Amino acid sequence: MSLFSCLLLWTLWAACSHGAMDECIDEDDRPQRCMPEFVNAAFNATVVATNTCGSPPEEFCVQTGVTGVTKSCHICNAADPRLHHGAVYLTDYNQPVQPTWWQSQTMLAGIQYPNSINLTLHLGKSFDITYVRLKFHTSRPESFAIYKRSSEDGPWTPYQYYSGSCEKTYSKNNRGFIRTGEDEQQALCTDEFSDISPLYGGNVAFSTLEGRPSAYNFDNSPVLQDWVTATDIRVTLNRLNTFGDEVFNDPKVLKSYYYAISDFAVGGRCKCNGHASECVKNEYSKLVCNCKHNTEGADCNVCKPFYNDRPWRRATAENPNECLPCNCNGKSAECYFDPELYRATGHGGHCRNCADNTDGPKCERCLANYYREASGQRCLSCGCNPVGSLSTQCDNTGRCSCKPGVMGDKCDRCQPGYHSLSEAGCRPCSCNPAGSTQECDVQTGRCQCKENVDGFNCDRCKLGYFNLDPQNPQGCTPCFCFQHSTVCESADGYSVHKITSTFDRDDEGWKGKQRDDSSVPVQWSPSSGEISLISEDYFPIYFVAPDKFLHNQLLSYGQNLTLNFRIQRHDARLSAEDVVLEGSGLRVAVPLIAQGNSYPGEETQTFVFRLHDTTDYPWRPTIKHADFQKLLYNLTSIMIRGTYSAQSAGYLDNVSLVTARRGPGTPARWVEKCTCPQGYLGQHCEQCDQGFRRSRPELRRFSTCERCNCNGHSDTCDPETGMCNCQHNTAGLSCERCKDGFYGDSTVGSSSDCKACPCPAGATCAVVPKTNEVVCTNCPTGTTGKRCELCDDGFFGDPLGEKGPVRACRACSCNNNIDPNAVGNCNRESGECLKCIYNTAGVFCDRCKQGFYGDARAANVADKCKPCKCSPYGTVDRQTACSQVTGQCPCLPHVINRDCGACELGFYNLQSGKGCERCNCNPIGSTNGQCDIVSGQCECQPGVTGQHCERCEVNFFGFSSSGCKPCDCDPEGSESAQCKEDGRCHCRPGFVGSRCDMCEENYFYNRSTPGCQQCPNCYSLVRDKVNQQRQKLLDLQNLIDSLDNTETTVSDKAFEDRLKEAEKTIMDLLEEAQASKEVDKGLLDRLNNINKTLNNQWNRLQNIKNTVDNTGAQADRARNRVRDAENLINTAREELDKAKEAISKVDIKIPTTSGDPNNMTLLAEEARKLSEKHKADADQIEKIAKDANDTSTKAYNMLKKALDGENKTSSDIDELNRKYLEAKDLAKNLEKQAAKVHAEAEEAGNKALKIYANLTSLPPINTKTLEDDANKIKKEASDLDKLIDKTEKEYNDLREDLRGKETEVRKLLDKGKTEQQTADQLLARADAAKALAEEAAKKGKSTFQEAQDILNNLRDFDKRVNDNKTAAEDAMRRIPQINATINEANDKTRRAEAALGNAAADAKDAKAKAEEAEKIANDVQKGSAKTKADAEKAFEDTMKLDKDVDKMMDQLTAAEKELEKKKAEADTDMMMASMASDNAKDAEGNARKAKSAVREVLNTINALLGQLGNIDKVDLSKLNQIDNALKDAKDKMAGSELDRKLKELNDIAKSQEDMISDYDRQIQEIRADIANLNDIKNTLPEGCFNTPSLERP
């Protein structure tokens, strides 16, 4: 196996071991394994050799290997620098051109087995050795060994043996191997490098891990980790290799055998066990690791003093195994590793010298009689009281162990309930637990009583209190007695009772309520047996208790209200009013977490609230106990908050209220029995005694009792209300007034104090103080007056019958057509309505006023009387009144509708004021008999005119129900455009036909002379003969007719005579005809030919004329369409100008309040309307464009049909086809522009609506956004204006093209298009080639990168390993080859990228890629510069660089310079692209010149066609002239160099094809080069299969 392959294997191993790591922490500041860089540890290191030539000087000869050849001999002199070969040359810089070497004495001096030579290399520090390499200047030894020491004072361990006689020399098997499980630190022996050849430059490389089974599990193999560790390397040279000629003892032969080594290299890393990324020299110039991971030592082989929490370990790829700090709780900075502690706890750091009175492996505990303070920082002295404590040691909180009855942290005082501290402790107090706090005076023993308790031992209630209860924090309950007594006691016969709601069957009457008292439904769950409330917002919702929990709950004072409650979400926001009680005009509330309750959560919890006024139960506001009891006595509401956040729910269950009731059971001792003062009765003094009443009945039982007072009209009164049982027509609480219907002073005290009132129906009355007049005060409804003798306002009648019979007062009936708040709506006597409203009138407002109509009695005001609103033009005498029922106005003749505002069908002129006039439309000439309501113009059939559609239009005829037909008289053949009634035109002389569009016999049409011209005289003879024959035929016909019509009988003889006569006549005619035929036969033949020719030419010219006429008509229509489109565009532009002007005038002001945004609404509405109008305009433009497209299509089809088969005018068809396509394209563009205008109009409308929507949401208004929107709309309007200008220009271009009607031949341009298509195809191929080239470039760059990596490895190898000369030369030979291949591939890739396509855009792309390549080259150059700088530094540190490496660097620099040419070549390609663009422009100019030439030829052809159309007689010479002119035109066309220009274009296209082919070829070459690079890559070995062996010396 080659040395190079072995080194690659080691490179792979180093990469797998992350050997190139530079940092000991990763990007997340986490520790990771790190190692120093891979170096040649032997470089410039001192080697001690046990034998060296030159002392004294001696001669040695160079071994040639050929017997009998004169040997080349030299002198080795240690004193001469030029001739010495000391051990210093073993580790210097190896230069193949000027080699240096160490050399031993020759065999002549006794250097041969068993004598051996040792070469000892001291590394100065332990290294992880990867390989040891020796490069021999002579032939390699027959036997030598490599040893190593793991420490500077350790034993030598054999590394590897090399021998041609392994068993004989080293007692080792030749090429042995190590099996799994065997000792992997044994040295092996091999004969692989023991041949005598080569005689010069042989390499021997030993890989320390090769052949070791655990090499691929190196991180977990301590054996191999120790195996590769070395501080010293020794090479022992045991036996020289010879040819056997030494047996002759020839001095010259013996002088040719010696040891010589030119390079001694040791590859490895400074050993830092994965905890350092570099080794540095310390203050003693000794090489040590710059340790990280809290490690130290020369090899980072121990943890720092305070980092011993786990045992030191070597870092691995999976675990950096950094040393961890000891946990001394901040009490020590010293620790050591305790293996036992580590095995027991997993933490081995044992702290030393703990501070702050602490102790333990982690300083985690305090010293005896010390405790740790609350902050945990230090330990404090316990300080226990010796009298009161049981021990001097306290607990972790500093509390001492106290004697009975003693308390305090230091046991220095008595506990509550104890007193008199002594050696025996404290004595207990004798306090009543129900009335005391269980504490007493520590000196006297007097008990501390609860708030409402008294006595030395707190065993009795204070005055005004009762029921000494241990559960009562105040001890005793205050007497209530409705505040009428302060003396009470516990009542007998009452037991404990609970009012509950368990919600087992329903919600039991519980309700939900918000703060605004609005009701919220309560949800009851039968499955969970609970009720719930759900909120949508943060406003709270309360559960409201039903009646059974309310009213008199006085017996619940001091007792508990209990409930189970949970919430849906945990984010509850509590308040001060979570539980609310209301009653007797009082209101108290408490938070849910008051009185020691927990915070509500998603789990059900029990909440307990004591109904008491003490401050321990913080009901707010704070009220006295009497008020709290008063509240409970008349409890009107219990509310429990159910929701505490938005979108949440609260769940309530098991509500109970403790109270008391009479009956057996657990005694309720909190029920009072009062001792009442005089005037009071009842258990709670809640009643007044006989003869007493409430002084303030509204206070009910809280009112004091006083004696009854009835002003002498009663002896008794109601004890609760104080109401007297009044007599003598008196009334009132104390009989202090007369009852209704009576008057007088009841306080006098006599039985006649009150008298009856003089009023009807028992009405009440009063006495006027000044006049003592009795006045009725409560008259019956509808009456008024002192004695109720008058009808009230709004009523009528005669209640006293003063004006006739008695009539009771009744309400006036006005059909709800009066103002009920008005006064005097009707007459009080008759009931007539006086103030009718809603346009009504009448006694009872039961009809509409004049000029109004409708139902005055309608219940709905809108259905009552409405104004007539008669039309003044259509109403009789311009009346304003109408039918009050139907609203119909009186209409003039032939006027209709309710308001007389329209004419009948077939009538008009409503504004005349005299009625409508009949249209009188002609039933034949009009469409429907109707006319314009203002002008009276009838709707006419096509071609019909006149106000009544009674006649045909000018130049029309055939008046009928379908309209009039156009005369369509030929303008040249008719005297006028108007025809006769039968449609026949008035013809000019020589013209015939209904349209005067044909010449009569013996007349012909000549385009050069107006009108039909008479044929030559020769045609007159023919015409005369024809007329004679026609006359004879006519005579014959007349004869036959006369025979049929005659009444006379013709005899057979006469008939035969006449028949013979006729036959004779016919034969004469036949003979004359035959004679004429013979005479004029030649003339007829010639005439027939001429006529045939003329007919063909005439038909052809007529077809052309029709085509031109149709084309002109189509062009006119298209021009009209274009004109219409221009008008629409102008209109759109005007509208846009208006829109821009309106937008520019927009001044959006911020309203000072949130007022009405009507102005902005109007603006948005106007913008929306404008956008809709633009949309309509765009639709119209689109329609016109479509019509123009259809027109162009129709024109194209007509022209194509007319010119089909005409070879000479095929160019015309092509040009018209082109025109059609251009018109179609323009129409499509117009449609697109219209669609764009349409879309922009819609977008403007949408934005306007959006502005409107935004404005309607004011306030606030973001003026900045509005200004931006306005500016944006302005910009869009400006863009739209530009778009319209562009569209107008396109329309102008189209119009000019249509006006020109030039039939230009574009064959050249068509061929140019074909060439363009070919070029497009070529460009497509170029694009495909570009894609392939880019992919190839990508692969080439990837291969380049891989080769560059290999090059870097080789460079690093050459710099640091300094292999033997043969391998180095081989590597150097391969490096230029690889670089040359890479450079060539990159150069071709660059050329392919730069040359793909001949367009400027492709050249720009190529230039960009060239710049990128230049950047890559610059990067490579920078890397090379750095390498060069490193080399220069190495040169300064040592002696000089190897010239071969310089040569390699020169080759790399040349490659970089070659890459720099890339940009220049890309610029050249840019210039070539520009030239190609210029060529394309020249081709376009040539095409234009060809177009001009074709146009000129076309004009000539048109002139010839014109001459053909002006033939006045057949002239063969003229036809020959035309033929010659046509040939001249063809020659002229041929002289226009069209063929040459076409050939030039073809040549350009062929050149482009050649360029593309060249690019394809280059791409194929690039692919081949890439394949070659891949082959080179694949030939690099991936492993080393040497099996070296070592043995101990």
UniProtKB/Swiss-Prot annotation:
SMART domains on file: EGF, EGF_Lam, Ephrin_rec_like, LamB, LamNT
Keywords: Basement membrane, Cell adhesion, Coiled coil, Disulfide bond, Extracellular matrix, Glycoprotein, Laminin EGF-like domain, Repeat, Secreted, Signal
BP GO terms, sorted: animal organ morphogenesis; axon guidance; brain development; brain morphogenesis; cell adhesion; detection of light stimulus involved in visual perception; eye development; muscle organ development
Any single Pfam family the record assigns to this protein: EGF_LMN_ATRN
Start and end residues of each stretch annotated as Domain II and I: 1014-1593
Domain Laminin IV type A as annotated: residue spans: 505-673
Domain of life, per lineage: Eukaryota
Disulphide connectivity of cysteines: 270-279, 272-289, 291-300, 303-323, 326-335, 328-351, 354-363, 366-379, 382-394, 384-400, 402-411, 414-426, 429-440, 431-447, 449-458, 461-476, 708-717, 710-724, 726-735, 738-754, 757-765, 759-776, 779-788, 791-809, 812-826, 814-833, 836-845, 848-865, 868-882, 870-889, 891-900, 903-916, 919-931, 921-938, 940-949, 952-964, 967-979, 969-985, 987-996, 999-1012
Keyword Signal assigned: yes
Subunit and interaction comment: Laminin is a complex glycoprotein, consisting of three different polypeptide chains (alpha, beta, gamma), which are bound to each other by disulfide bonds into a cross-shaped molecule comprising one long and three short arms with globules at each end.
Name of the featured protein: Laminin subunit gamma-1
Species of provenance: Danio rerio
